Amino acid sequence: MGEGPGYECSGNKLRNIFPSLFTEYSLISMTNYEIADHFSLLSKLMDIHGENSFKSKSYSNAAFNIEKLPKEIREMDDAELFSVRGIGENTGQKIKELVTTGKLSQLEKLLATTPEGILEMLQIKGLGPKKIAVIWKEMSIETLGELEYACNENRLAAVKGFGAKTQENVLQSIRYYQQNQGFHLWAEVEAIANAIMPQLQKAYPNNLFSLTGGIRRQLETVEWIDIISDLDKEKVKAQFETIADTAIEEEPNERLIVKMPNQPTLKFHLTDTTHYYTNLFTSTGSEEFMSAFFDKYQLPEAAKSEEEIFSTNGLQYIPAAMRETADILQKAADNSLNEIIKAEDIKGIIHSHSTWSDGLNTLEQMAKAAIDKGFEYLVISDHSQVAFYANGLSAERVAAQHQEIDTLNDKLKPFKIFKSIEADILGDGNLDYNSRVLETFDLVIASVHSNLKMSLDKAMDRVLTAVSNPYTTILGHPTGRLLLSRAGYPLDHKKVIDACAENNVVIEINAHPRRLDIDWRWIEYAMERGVLLSIDPDAHSVNGFNDVYYGAMIAQKGGLTAKNNLSSFTLAEFENFLEKYKEKKRSKVFA
């Protein structure tokens, strides 16, 4: 399908703000996520324009339900579509319009009367549709630049419903958004790169191709996809110049920039075959790494592999993911690099949610999917009671869930489900639930979910109090960050890690591609202090199990080993860990 022409009405920037509206897909390939994006935007624009709030809410609910459907709408007949919860006659007809024409006429009309800057405000944390409506209709502000200026002039604080605190938060969010324009999550660009590279290799089977730069180093966010090849420049151009709206630019040093619509930029590093591996090596490492390398070592004239480059210089091979700092070269010189973790090393799923709280799949479905994927155990950690927005479990529901787990464990042996909870760290640092309830869990993941805008002192008091709680087993997503969207609250990482070492608390590496939290830069220090880490998917569906791959990739950057990763423990090792942990916990509780 081509682009919906009506969506052009708000200008080209709309492509960048809501790329799913412009994705070139055939009608039969429109996914549930793309359909949900359209309805979510429709709901928000209706609220901004002050239209029927009941209908707006129904479209918002439809977007939420569509995104979580286990089956693609394109595979449903009318009877199946209209039986989906929250999809009535009106919404169902709009879905049919969207999947048959590629656009929504009602959304087109709203986009035609909405300034680009207002649409862009939807990307700013802390600004919902109703606040945006006030900014637009009452303050006559239509761009982010105008809004930033108004904040600097202290005008937003004077508007009813905002205040000084909201104004400061909005200003920070605008600056964070602007700083991150042009960056992409590694998980997103890796998927695109994995589609492009085989096509190139198939088209030119006798040439060499490799990812390089930040994407090869598995950085959590990257600006573009770096590719090195010995392919002729004109052939690279020919491969892409037939794609509509694609711009190709030449740069010095045999670089070619390919800019395709709604895709990350491709940066080709072109080289002759003789120097392919030396150029692969030099284009992979960070500036700090390469500077340190050239201070002490030499490149062989025509290396046949990267391994040869390292061995010629008396260095242990350094995986591409770890070529960030100068320090890693000294470890390679000392032959002290350990084998880093792989996704296959993960034996169990720790941190997952079911339909008991805000998950998509039932507990049994989660367990059976884990079995099918070869995992030995599942730690189910639904949200605690204070998380009302996520259907958090009351004490009574905790007891009922534990009964279901007991039943399933009898049924699914030798696979085992462990009783856990993602307990909210409250404002004072205490955990949700009293000790009688906390005692019933096999392990507790303690996480901050509310009041994320904290000073360093407040954040440290809150987190350290939770870490010192004898029932805390794992500190979940320690900073609360959302990559390219929300900066984490401030922490003194060393003090937090030291406290985890003192209290035998595991630190989570949340594997969700938008979290990857704790930051990989602190993994080495945690291991030095004897702190276990745990690559956990924070899975809210069976598909979420796949995120352990991204957790393993980011953990490689910090040099994490399987023996230092809790989720790499076998079932027997994990049970032994929990038993020893409970003994230590009891000694603290009754001390």
Question: Whereabouts are the PLM-identified features?
Answer:
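Active-site catalytic microenvironments in core metabolic enzymes, especially phosphate/sugar-handling
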Residues: 420-423, 550
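Charged catalytic cores and adjacent phosphate/nucleic-acid-binding surfaces used
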Residues: 218-354, 363-374, 379-380, 385-415, ...
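Accessory alpha-helical DNA-binding modules that contact the DNA backbone or grooves
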Residues: 43, 55-257, 263-265, 273-278, ...
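Short, Lys/Arg-enriched N-terminal segments with co-localized hydrophobic residues
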Residues: 17-29
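Glycine-biased, low-complexity coil/linker segments
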Residues: 2-4
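Charged, compositionally biased N-terminal leader segments and the immediate start
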Residues: 29-51
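Two-metal-ion RNase H-like nuclease active-site motif
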Residues: 211-214, 348-352, 422
